[in-house]
């Protein structure tokens, strides 16, 4: 659903911008996330524009605000990630931002949609009871959604501020990652490789499949191509279009994509990149950020 909203704000779903907006408003109301207009302003005009890889990029600001700052060791970053994912404060602040974005500064029709949906959720909670509400609504809607949202955000880009002399387009290319789910097969089906096949199967069932379903859904696996050609409407064909372009660059010996297999490897790549930077003295509390 988040992938559909993402392409909706880019205007890729329907020819009619009103239809794109209507669908995004309905889906974002159901998910309790940022409304169409504010998300479009931030994502299309800032994150995909000149603000990318600067302190004006609210995604980068969110990463730094959460404590994933340059100069920290990989051990520090991994420990901080674990503590953040289980932190009540992180989840409460995140969820508060989601609630606020649906109430403050929204058009009257959106406020009505929000209140009706929240009333429906309250009614369902009463009918379901406490235990079922926690299992069916609170855990998926709040905790799991926010965990996977953070993991997606951390791994979609290398969160490094644009370097001196680096153009906006170069920063989009240099700091965007492809996150493919899977790994190479063992060499053969010979009995001696049975352990390798068992590991391969376990990784696909327990790591790559959940990551594909929960963290990098839809076209998010090739989000790097999207940052190069964000106006292309064929979002359902992004993987094929990226492969065509990658093949062309390879033939021309200009290949500059960052292909990473396994979301866990993408996370390690990002943390490695951050750890190699100089420790930042930036006062992150001053950054304007968003979590949604």
Name each model-derived stretch.
Residues 4, 18-21, 29-139, 220-224, ...:
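Non-catalytic, topology-defining segments of multipass membrane proteins
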Residues 1-8, 37, 86-93, 138-192:
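Transmembrane alpha-helical segments that form the membrane-embedded catalytic/substrate-channel core
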Residues 13-31, 59-68, 167-202:
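Juxtamembrane helix-capping/reentrant segments at transmembrane boundaries
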Residues 12, 163, 232-233:
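Generic hydrophobic alpha-helical membrane-span motif
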Residues 12, 47-48, 155:
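Protein kinase-like catalytic domain
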Residues 146, 214-225:
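Short amphipathic alpha-helical segments
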Residues 1-3, 26-37, 142, 206-217:
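Membrane-embedded alpha-helical segments that form the functional core of polytopic membrane enzymes
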Residues 134-137, 197-207:
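Short, motif-level signal for alpha-helix interfacial/capping segments enriched in acidic residues
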């Amino acid at each position: 659903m988040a992938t559909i909203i993402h392409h909706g704000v880019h205007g890729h779903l329907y020819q009619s911008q009103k239809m794109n907006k209507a669908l995004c408003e309905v889906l974002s109301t159901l998910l309790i996330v940022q409304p169409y207009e504010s998300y479009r302003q931030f994502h299309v005009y800032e994150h995909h524009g000149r603000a990318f890889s600067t302190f004006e990029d609210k995604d980068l600001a969110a990463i730094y605000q959460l404590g994933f700052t340059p100069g920290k060791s990989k051990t520090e970053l991994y420990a901080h990630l674990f503590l953040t994912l289980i932190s009540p404060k992180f989840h409460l602040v995140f969820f508060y931002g989601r609630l606020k974005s649906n109430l403050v500064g929204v058009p009257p029709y959106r406020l009505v949609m929000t209140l009706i949906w929240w009333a429906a959720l309250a009614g369902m909670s009463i009918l379901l009871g406490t235990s079922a509400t926690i299992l069916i609504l609170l855990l998926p809607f709040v905790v799991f959604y926010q965990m996977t949202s953070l993991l997606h955000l951390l791994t979609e880009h290398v969160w490094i501020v644009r370097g001196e002399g680096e153009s906006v387009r170069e920063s989009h290319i240099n700091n965007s990652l492809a996150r493919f789910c899977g790994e190479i097969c063992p060499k053969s089906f010979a009995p001696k490789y049975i352990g390798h096949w068992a590991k391969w199967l376990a990784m696909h069932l327990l790591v790559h499949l959940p990551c594909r379903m929960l963290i990098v859904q839809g076209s998010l696996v090739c989000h790097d191509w999207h940052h190069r050609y964000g106006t292309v409407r064929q979002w359902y064909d992004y993987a094929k279009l990226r492969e065509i372009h990658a093949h062309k660059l390879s033939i021309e010996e200009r290949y500059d994509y960052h292909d990473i297999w396994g979301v866990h490897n993408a996370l390690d790549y990002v943390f490695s990149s951050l750890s190699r930077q100089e420790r930042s003295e930036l006062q992150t509390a001053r950054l304007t950020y968003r979590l949604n």
